[in-house]
Each structure stands twice: as C-alpha cells, then as structure tokens.
A protein has these predicted regions:
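Long, aromatic- and glycine/proline-rich binding clefts that accommodate carbohydrate-like moieties
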Residues: 151, 318-325, 372-424, 428
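Short, solvent-exposed loop/beta-turn-alpha elements that line the ligand-binding surface or hinge
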Residues: 44-47, 130-144, 187, 206, ...
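Extracytoplasmic "Venus flytrap"/periplasmic binding protein-like
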Residues: 71-145, 178-181, 186-189, 285-294, ...
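Hinge/lid segment of periplasmic solute-binding proteins
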Residues: 39-47, 114-169, 225-228, 232-237, ...
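Helix-loop-helix "hinge/cap" segment bordering the ligand-binding cleft or interdomain interface
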Residues: 153-227, 236-280, 347-353, 434, ...
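Conserved C-terminal helix/tail region of periplasmic/extracytoplasmic solute-binding proteins
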Residues: 52, 83, 178, 184, ...
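Extracytoplasmic/periplasmic substrate-binding proteins
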Residues: 58, 228-231, 236, 253, ...
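A structural signal for short loop-to-beta-strand junctions that line the ligand-binding cleft
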Residues: 100, 107-108, 136-177, 327, ...
Length: 463
C-alpha cells in the first residue's frame, strides 16, 4: 500500500475511535525454535537470556494466565527469556491496545481478535512481520481464511500471526432431546429442523424435574453479537459488505430475511427472552447450569465440561452435552463465524528479537496443540487442527465447521467500527422482538440505519 494510503487509514482509525466499544521490528532469524519441528525450541544463535517480554492476553478459557504460563514455561527455560503474562479483559482491550500503540507505552506482544488486526495495524504502532513468517511456514501452514486475518486489504504485510481459532456450533442436551422425542441425527440438519426441534422442546418444559427453556442467546450486552447473528444472514444469501468492501449490504432483502429468522425465534417463544438481557458468558453459564436445552457456543464450552474445576456445570448438563453443526438455510450449507486471536508485536518494544522468538515458539505445532487442549480453542495451524479435530466426534464437528462452514469479515481497517454499528442495531432489533412490537418494516428500517452509519465510515477511508 502506498504511504499516503496508510496515512489516511491511520487518520481514519484515530478519528472514529469514539465510536468503538470492546469487541473480541528487528528480527533474529535464529531465535526460538523451528515452528514445525520442536516444542521447546533450538538454542538461539543470538542470546536472549535475561530479557523480559510482556505479553497481554485476554480471557482465553477459565484459567487464562495460569494456562499461558504453563505453555511458555519451556520457552523460558530454553531461552532464558522471562515472559510476564498480563490479563486484559475483552471489555477494555480495544481501548487498552489502541492507547498503548499510539502512546508507545506498551507491552512487547499483545493478543488481538482476528477482526481487530486491520484496525490496529492502521494505527501504525505495530511491526510488519512479513520478512519473518517463512520461519513458521508462511501462508501454506494455515487455512486461507485464517491466514487472511493476518493481513490488511491493500497492503503488503503480515501484522498479526494467527495464534488460535474457533468456530460456533450448536450445543444441545441429549436428555432434553430424548424427552422431546427428537432424533439428534436430524434435529439440526436445517433451519426448519432446528425450529421444529425447538417447538418440541418448548412443549417439554422440564427435564429431570427442573425447568428448561428450548433455546437462548445473548442480546445487546454481548460483545460478539454480530458473530452470533451473521450466520443467519449468510445462510439467507446476505453479506455484511459489497464484494469490493466499499458499501454496506446489511440492509439487503437477504440480510433482512436472515435477521428475521432469529427474531422469529424470539417472537414465537422458542428463544428465552430473559437471555437477551445477559451477555455471552452469562448465557453460556445458563446452559451449563441446566437451564437451556440448546444454545450456540464455541469449542471452549466443550473443553470446560471436561475440567473438574469448572463448577458452573450441573451434573445433568455435563453428562448430556453434545454438539452439532450449524443448520443451513434453503440454499446454504450452514455457515458459522470463524474467529480467534492473533499475536502482534508493538513497534515500541525494546525486545523485538525476544518477542518474535516467543511468537515463533507459540506457532510450533505441538505447542499449539497443547494450548488448544488446555483452553478449549482450536490451533490456528493446519496440522495441529487435524490432530485436535480427530480426538473425538465432537471435536470433529468443530474441525468440519472451521474447514467447510467458516466465514469471517473483510480485513479492512474500518471493520471494527462497522461491526459496532451493526451490533447496536442488532441489539435494538432483538429488544424490539422481545417486546413484541417488531415488524418486518422495522427490521428494514433498523438495518437501513446500520448501513447508513457503516457507509459513512467506509466513505471516510475512501476520502
């Protein structure tokens, strides 16, 4: 990308920061280990011993700091580099990372959501790692959709190395489906089948003597609300942006149809309205506690069921949890949002060699597998994805979703702001559905507002 273009993107990113809410250097070619061969890493030619790398992470699993420290311990022992792992909540991380990039008062490495990488890159405060990624296998070591998250449209560069990935699938209670007389093999094969399943679950009312709702999902309080609703839009033939990424298409007839599928679940009493006042973690806990028969979640939920220290599970829910692929529409295969997190190095880092050595280590196939098994995500790299996906049938469902059903968003600097515009209107639409006063015309009007705001943001970049 030409320098003037990069400057314009930096200006846009700074100018529109007030609209945001929290979502989701020099090198040493010999530092760290060969990312495809060893776990602890080869001895670096240039000693990094005695350096300290600060690493910001988000809430990855139930014990994010302890799990990450466990994973980096062999790296510390082999290289002599100390890794300080610091937790930054998803609700504040966007502002924290932005402020650190602009001020220069930053850690060395930060985790960033895949959809946030273009925005952060446009700030100009992060290293371009393009000349180093051959050391970790380059693009061929990753699925195309995952590698795409490392880049910014229109630029030559790699700004965030993929760390882990995730997709969303249907979670359900086997005992609840049995009580409703529904065969799990056909319960979620299409959107029509999903709705029929929820109608039968609604009639059950109780499982094991305890009340249960057929389905639940979060509303406006969920930072990832757009990730939850866009699959319905995609399944209806809609899209978030035009093919050239210059105009919003969230108000297209197909997008309206997709959003309407979700709001109909609310209006027909199949989606527990009380869940709309909760955030994603709270809804997840409702499922784990036995109060929902079906919900949509990521692979970390499955992993948490295997952890004895996660006491949010009821015995019945833990014993009966199962997963199924997202159901498709009339002419679609059942899309799901595919996301995750990447690792970015701040330009202000005084330990860029050590920072890259850490990223290289965390890109090792076995290290990625070990970390995925700890926190319940999927590795970003192809080979360990296959390894984790083959561990049991439930993991196979997530692996299939990542390979065959996953979609994400355009890698443009404005996406974080556009997503926020969509989130605000999606939340309002769901609130109106819960209140019983939502018409098709109102859905269209609200999505028109979202599209208008998004077009304004996209136009600023074009200027």
């Amino acid at each position: 990308m030409r320098k003037s273009r990069m400057t314009a993107l930096m200006a846009v990113a700074l100018a529109v920061l007030s609209f945001l809410v929290a979502a989701c250097g020099s090198s040493s070619d010999d530092a760290g280990d060969n990312a495809t061969k060893t776990n602890a890493g080869a001895t670096p030619a240039k000693s990094l011993k005695g350096q300290t790398v600060r690493l910001w992470i988000m809430n990855n699993g139930p014990n994010p700091v302890a799990d990450t420290r466990k994973i980096v311990a062999p790296f510390e022992q082999k290289t002599g580099v100390k890794v300080n792992v610091e937790l930054v909540g998803w609700d504040v991380q966007l502002d924290r990372i932005r402020n650190a990039a602009v001020s220069g008062e930053a850690p060395d490495v930060t985790q960033a959501g895949t959809t946030q990488v273009p925005f952060f890159a446009a700030l100009g405060g992060f290293e371009n790692e393009q000349d180093k990624v051959s050391q970790i296998g380059g693009a061929s070591a990753y699925a195309p959709g995952i590698w795409k998250t490392s880049q910014v449209e229109g630029q030559d560069g790699v700004w965030g190395v993929p760390w882990f990935t995730e997709a969303r699938t249907i979670y359900y209670r086997k005992d609840a489906l049995k009580a409703a007389g529904v065969d799990p093999k056909t319960a979620f094969t299409s959107q029509e089948a999903l709705k029929a399943t929820l109608e039968k679950l609604k009639a059950v009312k109780e499982v094991g003597g305890k009340p249960i709702s057929p389905f639940g999902g979060p509303g406006k309080k969920a930072y990832d609300l757009v990730h939850n609703l866009m699959p319905w839009v995609w399944d209806a033939g809609g899209a978030e942006l035009s093919s050239d990424n210059k105009q919003s298409t969230i108000n297209s007839p197909q997008a309206v149809q997709g959003v309407k599928f979700a709001t109909d679940l609310v209006g027909e009493g199949l989606w527990d309205k009380s869940m709309l006042e909760r955030d994603g973690q709270q809804v997840e806990d409702q499922f784990k506690g036995g109060r929902l028969a079906v919900f949509i979640g990521g692979p970390w939920v499955l992993q948490s069921a295997k952890r004895a220290d996660d006491d949010t599970w009821s015995d019945a829910a833990r014993k009966n949890v199962a997963v199924a692929p997202m159901p498709g529409g009339a002419n679609s295969k059942g899309y799901t949002f595919i996301g995750g997190s990447n690792l970015m190095v701040f330009k202000s880092s005084q330990h860029k060699d050590a920072a890259w050595a850490l990223i290289k280590y965390l890109s090792d196939d076995q290290v990625q597998t070990d970390y995925a098994n700890l926190m319940g995500m999927f590795p970003a790299r192809l080979k360990p994805q296959e390894q984790v996906g083959a561990t049991d049938p439930d993991h196979e469902a997530f692996y299939a979703a990542i390979k065959d059903q996953g979609r994400s968003y355009a890698p443009i600097a404005q996406w974080a702001q556009v997503e926020n515009a969509y989130k605000n209107q999606f939340g309002q639409i769901l609130d109106q559905a819960a209140g019983g006063d939502l018409s098709d015309q109102q859905i269209q009007s609200d999505l028109d507002k979202a599209a208008k705001e998004a077009d304004g943001l996209l136009a600023q970049s074009a200027g």
